[in-house]
A protein has these predicted regions:
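Eukaryotic low-complexity, mixed-charge intrinsically disordered interaction/regulatory segments enriched
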Residues: 1-48
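Short acidic linear motifs
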Residues: 50-63, 67-491
Length: 491
């Protein structure tokens, strides 16, 4: 019987390309008998053994075939996937729709404000000096007089804008005009004017012209409120917020040294009530942003290359693969993409209506896969990329709205404490002592919905802040950055 080990060895050597004589000599050298070797050869010859080289050729051919199949498959994958792709029906976004707003030019503060850019005077090398003067860190009387004398025309336009009953940017008055191609009004001069107005107000206060000073400071607040009550973009809303903050902080500084009568102080305090109403304006600005996004998607579908460029960037917009995928339902599903933005807007609107203490930071998680290979098979990949590029976390904007409410309440309380001190030559033990003689109700802390905090001994008004923990007030230069946003009573 032929030895199986010998058979296996000979087969192995044959597969590796050795001939019979080479195998035989090797076996003889290792002690195998010639008769056993010959018998093994005879057995093997009955079943032909294919050399290993032929098996490798077959494997190579199989690999090449698989590669070709994959390449062809990838080339035709979009068309194959497109057969199974299906966008959802047009979404119901009626809750996010905007209406056409009509404001006659003579009632519109917009047309006064746009004149500021041509007449405003603010030396660039004095920007920090202006900021320090507004913040109360320094005072340069000569420079203040220069600012006032060189900006008389600008102050006139600003006062006229404050007296107009309404504000409405004509570009966003009609929803049909709200597109990514809409020309945005430059508003930097409006923020500049709020700072210059603050300097003028502080200058008037130093001249003991307290009523004129307060009226000047409140111009910024009145204009900011009008902008917030309009159909405004988010950028306009934020500019308005800054203008109101500058004006209200200036009011607090003027009150400290004012000689106004109690009747006048009460009148100014009551006049601040209207400045709490800013939620609807913020909600409208969120709807305007959604309108931008929805119209952008429509424009991309229609082949508007300029809109595509503004969304994905100039380099990517020239990429033929991007243009090809936009026309492929699998990679770009407009209605599903609109739904992403609609839900994003609704979350922000819901947060804007919540008490400030209940607002939780919402993380905008990227939807598109970062792996290029996986992205190639990702449904609505282009839509998700557009969402990732445009959607940002707006919780901070809502927090700023809450801070604005706090600033209004703190300013209101400070004015009435001043009136109380004028009457009694003392500070109230609590804010409730101001009701009803000086206040109709105690101002609320927007972060916990309870009464604004007050300490007669520390001479401070403060909020519990975003963490809603009462730490007894905080110390610092900027109340916005404090754990307990705190306002000093400097009188």
């Amino acid at each position: 019987m032929v030895n199986q080990q010998l058979l296996d060895y000979i087969k192995q050597q044959l597969q590796q390309g050795m001939n019979n004589e080479q195998i035989k000599q090797s076996l003889l050298a290792n002690g195998w008998q010639n008769t056993d070797i010959q018998e093994a050869f005879n057995t093997i010859m009955q079943v032909p053994v294919q050399p290993k080289k032929r098996r490798w050729k077959k494997i190579v051919l199989i690999i090449i075939g698989v590669i070709i199949f994959l390449i062809v498959g990838l080339l035709f994958l979009p068309k194959i996937l497109n057969l199974f792709a299906k966008d959802i029906a047009p979404i119901n976004d009626s809750d996010l729709k905007l209406q056409k707003v009509l404001v006659v030019d003579k009632d519109n503060a917009y047309f006064d404000l746009i004149k500021l850019g041509n007449v405003i005077y603010e030396p660039k090398d004095k920007s920090q000096t202006i900021l320090d003067m507004v913040a109360g860190k320094t005072w340069d009387n000569q420079f203040a007089e220069e600012i006032i004398s060189r900006n008389m025309q600008a102050f006139e336009y600003f006062a006229q804008a404050a007296q107009r009953p309404k504000y409405q940017n004509p570009e966003s008055a009609d929803p049909a005009n709200i597109t990514l191609n809409m020309i945005l009004t430059p508003m930097n001069s409006w923020r500049q004017m709020a700072r210059l107005s603050a300097i003028r107000a502080l200058y008037l206060a130093k001249q003991s012209k307290n009523k004129e000073a307060l009226d000047e400071a409140l111009n910024s607040v009145n204009i900011g409120q009008k902008i917030q009550e309009s159909q405004a973009t988010l950028i306009e809303y934020l500019v308005a917020l800054v203008m109101k903050e500058v004006g209200l902080e200036t009011v607090q500084k003027i009150i400290s040294s004012s000689k106004l009568t109690n009747a006048e102080l009460k009148q100014y305090s009551q006049g601040l009530d209207k400045f709490y109403k800013n939620e609807n304006g913020l909600i409208t600005s969120f709807k305007v942003e959604y309108h931008f996004q929805s119209r952008a998607i429509d424009s991309i579908v229609s082949g508007d290359t300029e809109v595509l460029k503004s969304v994905v960037g100039e380099e990517e917009s020239r990429n033929p693969e991007i243009a090809k995928k936009i026309k492929t339902y699998y990679y770009f599903q407009p209605n599903k993409t609109k739904l992403l933005f609609a839900e994003y807007a609704r979350v922000n609107i819901k947060n804007a209506n919540k008490p400030c203490g209940e607002i939780k930071a919402t993380e905008v998680k990227p939807l598109a896969l970062t792996n290029p290979a996986k992205l190639y098979t990702e449904e609505n990949a282009i839509g998700k990329i557009i969402y990732d590029v445009i959607a940002i976390n707006l919780t901070g904007v809502i927090t700023k709205k809450c801070q604005e409410d706090l600033l209004v309440g703190a300013t209101q309380a400070m004015i009435t404490i001043k009136a109380y001190k004028n009457d009694t030559n003392n500070y109230p033990a609590s804010l409730s002592e101001l009701v009803p003689s000086y206040l109709s109700s105690v101002p609320r802390d927007p972060f916990n919905g309870k009464s604004l905090k007050y300490s007669a001994t520390k001479k401070i008004l403060y909020s519990v802040g975003e963490d809603m923990q009462d730490s007894g007030g905080s110390i610092g230069d900027d109340w916005r950055k404090m754990t307990d946003p705190t306002f000093k009573i400097n009188f």
